Amino acid sequence: MDRLHEFDNILYDRKENTDSLINYWVDYSNPLTWQFWILIAILLVPLIILYFKIDRSKVFLIGFFGYNVHVFFTFIDIYGINRGYWHYPYQVIPALPSISLDTSLVPVAFMLIYQWTLNNQKNYYIYAIILAAIFAFILKPILVNIGLFRMYGNINYFHLFIGYIIVLLISKWITWIFHKLYKPNFSAE
């Protein structure tokens, strides 16, 4: 029973920590701050661009790829937050610290790169690595400088770059596997 009691104490501490982060959001990261509205723009503008730019003839392929980017980027981001490697002082929704990046900016950017490489017979890996470098070495430092992203411990931008590379590789490979397995069923049933 001691193990379960210890587990309950850990969860209680985690709830207290979550409550503190929500209180921080109410005080400093609410809709009355300019940071909140920057994050809203980071969330909505890429989705609007995607709506107009996505190749509708490949919408499921590109959408599936984007979903993979979203899922794996979210996994890596949650891992980094939970391990204390980084965090987002300002958030659109307090329970989802990086929703603007995880669900919009990063997936949409990689989707548009993926679409462009498909439509122009270009090497996906080269352009995706360039985009990963832009995110890790240009966008993240900007977010740090304006206070929207914080790194802790020994984490640096190269580590973030490696995270982006992992996401872009896994997402591409899973999409490729599912695309190869796809066999359309044209029966009337």
Predicted regions and their residues:
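Aromatic-rich, lipid-facing transmembrane alpha helices and their immediate juxtamembrane interface loops
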Residues: M1-E189
